[in-house]
Amino acid sequence: MSRRNATSFVDNNTLTSSGISGSGSMSPPITSRPASGQASPLTSNGSLSPPQYADDQGSVSYNLDSPRDLSPLLLSELACLNMREVVARPGLGTIGRQIPVKSNFFAMDLKNPKMVVIQYHVEIHHPGCRKLDKDEMRIIFWKAVSDHPNIFHNKFALAYDGAHQLYTVARLEFPDDQGSVRLDCEASLPKDNRDRTRCAISIQNVGPVLLEMQRTRTNNLDERVLTPIQILDIICRQSLTCPLLKNSANFYTWKSSCYRIPTAAGQALDLEGGKEMWTGFFSSAHIASNYRPLLNIDVAHTAFYKTRITVLQFMCDVLNERTSKPNRNNPRGPGGPGGPGGYRGGRGGGRGGSYGNFGNRGPPGANVRDDFGGNGLTFTMDTLSRDTQLSSFETRIFGDAIRGMKIRAAHRPNAIRVYKVNSLQLPADKLMFQGIDEEGRQVVCSVADYFSEKYGPLKYPKLPCLHVGPPTRNIFLPMEHCLIDSPQKYNKKMSEKQTSAIIKAAAVDATQREDRIKQLAAQASFGTDPFLKEFGVAVSSQMIQTTARVIQPPPIMFGGNNRSVNPVVFPKDGSWTMDNQTLYMPATCRSYSMIALVDPRDQTSLQTFCQSLTMKATAMGMNFPRWPDLVKYGRSKEDVCTLFTEIADEYRVTNTVCDCIIVVLQSKNSDIYMTVKEQSDIVHGIMSQCVLMKNVSRPTPATCANIVLKLNMKMGGINSRIVADKITNKYLVDQPTMVVGIDVTHPTQAEMRMNMPSVAAIVANVDLLPQSYGANVKVQKKCRESVVYLLDAIRERIITFYRHTKQKPARIIVYRDGVSEGQFSEVLREEIQSIRTACLAIAEDFRPPITYIVVQKRHHARIFCKYQNDMVGKAKNVPPGTTVDTGIVSPEGFDFYLCSHYGVQGTSRPARYHVLLDECKFTADEIQSITYGMCHTYGRCTRSVSIPTPVYYADLVATRARCHVKRKLGLADNNDCDTNSRSSTLASLLNVRTGSGKGKKSYAPSVDDESYSLSDATSDQILQDCVSVATDFKSRMYFI
C-alpha cells in the first residue's frame, strides 16, 4: 500500500528510496501558506518556522545564546520586588447579558458580630509510639469531656478540630485557676491490643479570638488572618464528628466531606472488586463580598471499601473483577512463579514473598487456577475449599489490592485489633515460624498448626497469610480470621470502568443537583444543631442569589480556500461546526508510516482507513499522502520499540523524512500507548498519532476530521483562530503578546514512596494569534508547588517567540493552574521574580508588563440559573460565558467565576480566576473577555473548553511527562514497583540523594551508598533526561 503500489501494504521489508518522497532531511515538516487572500500573521513569507532572525529592533540587542550576567543594580531591583500586595478589583464587569443566578452558598449569621471565643492548644498522649489519626484523637478527647464534667460544663460549647485546636464559648475552669491542665481517661481504640487504653490530654489556654470577619482585611498576602472563618468551619462540622451524639455514628468524615455509612444493601453503588461508592456532602466556610460569611455545601461522591465483609470475600471480589476472563492480552504474559526470598520470577511472573516461593503449584489435581489469570472459574465463598490455593498471577493481583489496607483480626473472642497489611506471605500450611511452647522450649511450626492448636483447625490452610503490623515484626494472620476494617476510603487508582460508574452516578443535571444540595442542607439540621446554637451561629436554608453576565463568544475563522462558504462561524452553546470549512493554516505532511498492532488480516480495514483519512485531510485543505510509505505489524510494546527503530533506520538510509507515524492499537492500553510516546517524543523525534482499531474499522467523517485536527497541529499548522474584537485586537494582536500556561503535577502517596518527583510544564505561544504553542518540562522535588527552574523555561519560551515572530513580547499573560489560596504568596513571589529575571537576562531594558492569573478547577462552587428560560441543554446548565464577580467572590483582591464551556453531562463547574498581579492594567471586562476568548482556541475540538487553552495544554504536557518519568522509575499504572530490582529502575539510582537527607526516611529501594552514590545535580539530570523531548519538538505541539 505504498503510494506507488497499494498491494505492498503487507510488506514489512524496507522500501527503496523511490518509494518514499521527501527532502532528505530530518527538519520540521513544511507548512503551507495561509489560505488565499489571507496574509500570514506570523512572518512576511508565511513560514511557521523561520530561521534565527537578526535583530531588527534598532537599539535593543538580545543575547539569545546564553544568559547575561545581571548587574548588582538589577539584582537589587529584583530583590525588592513587592509581590505581597493584593491586586485591587478594578471595578465590576459590565459587558454581557445579565441573568439572575443561584449558587450553592448559604449565608451564615452571627448572633454577636463581635463574638469572642477562647482558643486552647490540645496535646493527646498515647502510651504507644504509633501516630494517632483524627478519628482516634476525637474518641480520646470526647471521652475526656465525658469523664470530666467539672471542667467541661457544657459539651456543646466546645469546637474541636480533631487535632490540636479547641475553641470554647466561655473560659474553661482549670484547677487552681491554672492556664493549663492534664486530664486522664480510658478510651477504647480498635488499633490497640487491649479493651481500654489509658491516655492523657494536655490542654493549654492560648487566649481569646475575636470572630470578626473584617479581621481578615489586609492588602498583604502574608498577613491574612484566616482564624475566624476556620473556627466557623470547625463549629459547623461538630455535630457529625462528635461521638457523643448518636447521629455521628451514621457518618464518616474525610477532610471537608461527611459521608453517610451504608447500613443496608442498595444504599451504596457497587463498583466491583470489593469497592462501593458512598454519597455525602462537602461543606466549607468562606468569606464573600462585604465580608459576609458563607457556607459552601455540595454533593460529594467517593469510593470506599465495602463494609462488613471478610478478607476472604474481599479476595473473591478482587479476583473475580481482575481474572474473570482468560488474560490473553496481558502484556506481561503468564511469566514464571515468584522466586525465593522475595525476588521476581520471569517477566510477568508473580512476585515472591519475603520467606519463599509464591508460585508453588501444589500437587496434581489441586484446586488452583492457571497463571493466565483464570480458566472460567468464579471465586465465591461457596466454592472455596480446604485445597483452594492461588496461582502466582492471582497472588500478585490480590497482594497489590490488599497491600496498605487496614484489617481487623477476629481470631480472639471479644478482642478486635486493627492492623495495616504489609504484604501477602506463604500459605498458612507452609509458612513456618519459631515459637516457645508451654515448657519453654523453642519449636518450629506452621501458622496453620499454631492456629489449629490455639483456635481450631483452619478451613483454608493453603491460602496465603497476611503480614500485618510493624514491617519489622513477624505477625502473620490467616485470611479467614480477618475482616476488612470500615469505614475505609479507597485511595488507589480506580479502573476506567469504576471511574465511569462514579461519573455516571454523580452526573445529574443542574436542577437535580440543586435539589440534592438543598436536601443535604435540610438533613444537616443546622436550625437545631446544638453546637451552632451555643456559639450563636445561624445558617440560612436558602441559596445565595446574585447576578451573572453572559459574555458573547468570539467568532471563529477558518481558511478561505472554499469560497462557497463564509470562513467565519459563530459559536452557539459553546460549539461550532466545520462543515465544508478548510483549515486556517493547513500544514503539509510529506510522508508517513504506520505501525499496526493488530491482526495482519485486517489489511483491508487499514487500507480503507488510509483512503478515508487522506480524503478528509485533502478536503480540509491539508496536503496529505495517499498511502503510508511503510506498514509494519506487531503485538507488544517490545515490538513498538523495534518497529520505531526499523522505520527510523529505513528513512535514514534513504535520506528521506518521516513526518508522522500512525499507530493502530487493538484496544486501550496505557503501557503500549506510553511506549509509543516515549519512542516518538524522546528516542526518535518523530510525531506519532495513536488510533484505536474500532475507529479504523469505521472511519466516519467526524472521526477522520478529529484525527486531521490533531495531525495538522502536530505538523505546525493552525486549525482556526478567533476573530479579534476591540479588546482582543488591543491586547493580543496590535502588540505581540506571549500567553503562558503553567501547571505542576504532584505524585500520589504511593508514588512518593518510590521517589516520584513533581513535574512542571510551561507552555507558551510561538505565534501572534495565539494558536501555536511550544512547551518546556522541568522535574523538581516532590510536592513543591512553585516552579524551581522557571527562569530557564521562560527565557527559552521568549527566545522561541522572538525567533518565530521577529518581535519581542510586549506583554506577558500567565495562566497558572493548581495553586491553592494558601500558596498564593509563595508562588507569586518566586515565579514572578523568575519571569522578570528571565526578561532582564535577555536585555537590561526588556521589561514587559506581566499579568499573573491563577486558575482553580478543584472547588465546589456551582452556579444555577434561577429561571428555566436561561438554562441550556438537557443538563439545564448556565450558558457558556456566564461570569460572576459579585456576591460569592472574595471581598478583597480581583477574582471571578467563569463558566466557559457547555455542560453536556452533569452540572457545569465554573473555573475560578484570581488575578494576583496585573501590570498590564486590565479592566474587569478586558481580562474576562480575553480569558473567555482563550477558551475558544483549543485545537483538538470545535468547542469551547472549561479553562484557557494554555493551561489545558500545560496539563497535557505535564501528564505526558509524568508518564515518561513513571516508566523510567519502573512504576506501573497501579503504582506498583519492582522493589527488588536494583539496576532496572531509576528509583535505585536516586535513593541516596532523594528524600533521605536531614533525617527524612528514604522510601526508595535500599542500595549501597558507596556503589550508587550520586550528587543532587546528577539525580536531577537523570530525571530531567526522562522528560527531555527531541529538540524540534520543543516548539511544536507534540502533546496534542
Swiss-Prot record:
One of its GO terms (biological process) is spermatogenesis. Residues 660-966 form the Piwi domain. Residues 333-356 have a biased composition (Gly residues). Residues 1-61, 322-367 are annotated as: Disordered. InterPro entries: ArgoL1 (IPR014811), ArgoL2 (IPR032472), Argonaute_Mid_dom (IPR032473), Argonaute_N (IPR032474), PAZ_dom (IPR003100), PAZ_dom_sf (IPR036085), Piwi (IPR003165), Piwi_ago-like (IPR045246). It holds the Pfam family PAZ. Residues 1-15, 33-50 have a biased composition (Polar residues). Residues 16-32 have a biased composition (Low complexity). CDD domains: PAZ_argonaute_like, Piwi_ago-like. One of its GO terms (molecular function) is single-stranded RNA binding. One of its GO terms (cellular component) is cytoplasm. Residues 379-486 form the PAZ domain. SUPFAM superfamilies: PAZ domain, Ribonuclease H-like. Signal peptide: none annotated. This is Putative protein tag-76. The lineage of its organism: Eukaryota, Metazoa, Ecdysozoa, Nematoda, Chromadorea.
